[in-house]
């Protein structure tokens, strides 16, 4: 019998739903995917914007952004991280250019001077209907009426609705809204996904219906993970996304390696 993780996170639940075998390799077998170009790009952009929003509102300028980005790059290990990648999709200069373009696109989506943040990179640890959950919320903002808005920065593509359903797109933030309510009894009014590279903001209002649906996903996924751990059967979901999967690349996914014993 395999041992399931003690805690789940919104992202680990999302991974199990997209491919149970990938979840097993990452969270049970502990075979972690090494950092990639896209991972580093997203992390660097998140980090710089986090520090931008630590500035006093009137100091949240393009010039401040440049200084923060230069400092994080040179003095906090980012130059070494990016230069050390074995697979580079562009030059290091290209990485910096893409990152800075994504950061400056923030001004097309909101005005940092008047954006009122309640917190950033907030660790949340709670239980939803007996399912132990933990994770980190990118940021919590307060709307004009003081209501809570959970936001997430994205540096990748805007998902095509033909392939990504709304409940899948919003599940992680809805799960965080559930977790916040369990912790402090405060309700979240709205969710935001800020696609920085594309200058696109998607928003959705939080309703009791979509919260209830997210709660069901959490509980059912926990039950499915526990059952898979008992049986040892973690299905492989073979799709076009497999072409970008690290586990296929290193030949340990049973769907592509021909070794069914890896299941």
Task: Explain the meaning of each model-derived region.
Residues 48-120:
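A non-catalytic, helix-rich entry segment at domain boundaries
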């Amino acid at each position: 019998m395999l041992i399931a993780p003690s805690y789940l996170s919104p992202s680990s639940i999302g991974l199990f739903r997209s491919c149970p075998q990938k979840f097993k390799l990452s969270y049970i077998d502990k075979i972690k995917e090494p950092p990639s170009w896209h991972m580093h790009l997203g992390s660097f952009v998140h980090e710089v914007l986090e520090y931008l929003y630590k500035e006093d509102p009137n100091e949240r300028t393009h010039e401040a952004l440049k200084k923060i980005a230069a400092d994080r790059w040179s003095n906090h290990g980012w130059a070494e991280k990016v230069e050390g990648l074995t697979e580079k999709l562009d030059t290091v200069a290209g990485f910096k250019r893409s990152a800075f373009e994504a950061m400056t696109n923030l001004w097309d989506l909101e005005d940092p001077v008047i954006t009122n943040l309640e917190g950033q990179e907030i660790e949340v640890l709670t239980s939803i209907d007996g399912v132990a959950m933990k994770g980190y919320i990118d940021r919590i903002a307060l709307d004009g009426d003081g209501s809570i808005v959970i936001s997430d920065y994205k540096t990748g593509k805007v998902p095509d609705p033909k392939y990504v359903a709304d409940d899948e797109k919003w599940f992680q933030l809805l799960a965080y809204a559930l977790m916040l309510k369990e912790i402090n009894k405060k309700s979240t009014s709205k969710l935001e996904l800020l696609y920085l590279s594309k200058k696109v903001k998607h928003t959705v209002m939080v309703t009791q219906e979509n919260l209830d649906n997210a709660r069901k996903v959490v509980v059912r996924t926990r039950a499915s993970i526990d059952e898979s751990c008992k049986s040892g059967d973690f299905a492989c979901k073979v799709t076009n996304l497999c072409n970008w999967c690290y586990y296929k690349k290193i030949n340990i996914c049973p769907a592509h390696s021909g070794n069914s014993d890896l299941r």
